[in-house]
From Swiss-Prot:
Signal sequence residues: 1-32
Major location (coarse): secreted
Xref: InterPro entries: Beta-gal/glucu_dom_sf (IPR036156), Beta-mannosidase-like_N2 (IPR054593), EBDG/EBM (IPR043534), Galactose-bd-like_sf (IPR008979), Glyco_hydro_2_Ig-like (IPR006102), Glycoside_hydrolase_SF (IPR017853), Ig-like_fold (IPR013783), Ig_GlcNase (IPR041351)
UniProt GO BP: chitin catabolic process; polysaccharide catabolic process
Protein localization: Secreted
Identification of the protein by name: Exo-beta-D-glucosaminidase
Gene: csxA
Organism of this sequence: Streptomyces avermitilis (strain ATCC 31267 / DSM 46492 / JCM 5070 / NBRC 14893 / NCIMB 12804 / NRRL 8165 / MA-4680)
Record's compositionally biased regions (Low complexity): 813-828
Location of region: Disordered: 28-49, 813-833
UniProt lineage: Bacteria, Bacillati, Actinomycetota, Actinomycetes, Kitasatosporales
Molecular-function GO term, any one: exo-1,4-beta-D-glucosaminidase activity
SUPFAM superfamilies, alphabetized: (Trans)glycosidases, beta-Galactosidase/glucuronidase domain, Galactose-binding domain-like
Amino acid sequence: MFHRPASVRRFVTTAVALGLLSTLSTGARAGARTHEPPPRPTTVSSTAGSTTALTGYAIQSTAKVTDPAAAVSSPGYPASGWYPAGARSTVLAALLAGGKYADPFYSTNQQKIPKADFQVPWWYRSDFTVADTSARTYLDFSGVISAADVFVNGRQIARSADVAGAYTRHELDVTSLVREGANTVAFRIQPNNPNKNLTMGWIDWLEPPPDQNMGIVRDVLVRRGGPVALRDAHVITRLDVPSLATADLTVKARARNDSDAAITATVSGSVGATSFRRSVALAAHETKTVTFTPADTPGLHLTSPRVWWPAGMGGQPLYALDLSASVSETVSDTVHESFGIRDVKAPLNSDGARQYSVNGRRLLIKGGGWSPDEFLRWDSTYVEDRLRYALDLGLNTIRLEGHIEPDEFFDLADRYGILTLPGWECCNKWEGNVNGSGSGDEWTAADYPVAKASMAAEAARLRDHPSVVSFLIGSDFAPDAKIEKTYLDALKAADWPTPVVAAASDKSSPVSGSSGMKMTGPYDWIPPNYWYAKREGGATGFNSETSAGPDIPTLDTLRRMMTPAELDTLWKNPGAKQYHRSPSSVFGTLKIYDAALAGRYGAPTGLTDYVRKAQLAQYENVRAQFEAYGRGATDASKPATGVIYWMFNSGWTSLHWQLLDRYLDQGGAYFGAKKANEPLHVQYSYDDRSVVVVNNRPAAVSGLTARVTLFNTDGTQKYDKSATGLSVAGDGAHSTALTLPSSVSGLSTTYLARLVLTDSAGKEVSRNVYWLSTRPDTLDWAHTDWYYTPTTSYADLKGLGSMARVPVSATASTTAGTDGASTTTVTVRNTGSGRTPSLFTDVHLVDSKGKPVLPVQWSDNEVSLWPGESATLTVTYRTADLHGSAPRVRVSGWNTAEQTVPAA
């Protein structure tokens, strides 16, 4: 048994999140590395209630360190030749930042990194200085992967058996060990194996990092305070629904006496203009929960509260809780916590599907599965850019299957009104007890306290974020009775406020019951008409993860991630193993996808032709997925209640499961989703040929006109019909405008459908162009597998290949704002003299060298224009991302020559 120093106390508290490195540099240069000096010591504040994050570490493999732990963890130890690491860093992230290895996102470079280097423990060593030792000092940390022995100033204060699990949070009282001046903390990090440890893995998302993310990926905090510590502060909100006229707040915190004597502390705080205080008598080393309610503090009963809403439904106001504990009128500790007031319900509907409502208003969950950086490097700007993309796409939700991000992520989600669905991951240790022959070791007695501490930690960290609307305690499988009780006990103790979901699949647990979700795929290619069937992955119920699989990025991105030889194989050999798709044998090739691409559009004639066909295919498929779920959201029978696109993004340079690529470039998948989810939208239904108007705005709309025109691929008009006086309610309601006939005389096998929606003033408010076939895709439902449904015959879209080339003119100008952002306005016009439209006209903002400027947000893109028609598009971006270059605009299209025009 390990004996700690008598005065070193360990408190297991709550979890911070997956912190990541502060740079996304991948270390593009290989070769000899010049060792840098260790990070400068962190200066720790002496202020009561302060928290100071360690600024970084010197790290080294234990295979190269022969000195004893007492020496390594003592001030003054010469860590010469060690590698510098950021405050949140895996081992490999630090080595990549130092240039030890070539860019792992390019080609197969990652295969060249030796895995054996990470199968031994690594030292993480950091120095900090303390000017005043009279205050109490604690180490507060989470995010250790997979486990660690912890030392301070030469003394071991925790063993890896105690500090285990990526999500557990630990608070160690080191008051007796710190000294004035230099101090040292050292972690001996154990290797990670997600099948054996309750940490995180990458499943079939991408090629797993050679170090399996071993390291410290959250901040290690040095906390200072007086004899009484405040912990676990939070606010329980009760909003009156549906009136939203009042809300009751309950403030709770634990006051802990860390001294050897009895103390009377004063706990005081405020929420807005309401203040409260109470004297609390504490025996030596006693902890009490202090609670303030409207019964004793009338100001905690709010009238006309500022209510938090998801984006598009209202604003995102936040409140602040400030607390302090004082002893003899001297501040001992302080707490600041933000929270929002909102109500979340998610009952099962009559079909057994989970139906979310926020503040009494039902909504269709439309989201994507989130991936962090493969090496868990944190960059707040990069994360914010992606969340802004989610809003641009009309999404309202992000699902986090494991890899639960740091506090800053949820702060951003709160601010932007993006709902989040965090939960545990599948296919490894987390589900080892319940997934039969699947991956992951079964749990031992030692795993249950780690799981409970993980749940308690995440619950305490996430509960006050209004963006968090559930926690999924299972993914592909629901927990068994013992594991579920472990989780639910922790959630109850944390006053968890939102629905707990047993699994992301159609599973049940003994207490939580049915999940109300489905995980029926698909994960690989299926045709657009698949989504309209109310079966399997089609638009009924809540599909927690689904897409048509591969999402080939733009040609610009492909050339950044693959060698010329690999790109040659990409379009020539559908059966070739694709390193940048998935390590899974099921998803290792593009065989299913490529067969469909050739069968529907014609065999590719080269890389450029392959990529342009891929963008068309991805646009129509992603659009259909979201349109089908959008149309089905208010169906009386078997309505659609939620859809999570699998995935929103990838953690590396990928060929599948992404609406946007690693570099934030946007292609067919992105703009297909953006089109489908626009606020007021006209769409075509692949199942019954109906033309439907979907209103995602809160308010009803009337006086609309929907017009549908069908064209042969040469531009010859074959059908035209309008429906006037249309009205549609808000909050996702839809109205059928008209239904197209089953056949139209003279219509070519491949044809185009142009849908235009105008308001009562005749202004165009939605435009949607489809490329369709009189020979639809035919699905073989009887042979459906878990990841796709085979297609026995493909829609014939080969006629697009014979479309005449048409000229498109483009003009552009740029205005720089005072906020560091610029806006470029582009007008594109089909100047052809015939009847042929310019199909799928894409506009990219580039610099003087032709490199895409990213990230960007376009008002619209990949537009189709008939002769004489024009479209004015705007794109906003950070001026600094031009890097001093003059902006230019590159215009290309399905049947339009590429050109680049100035945009200064």
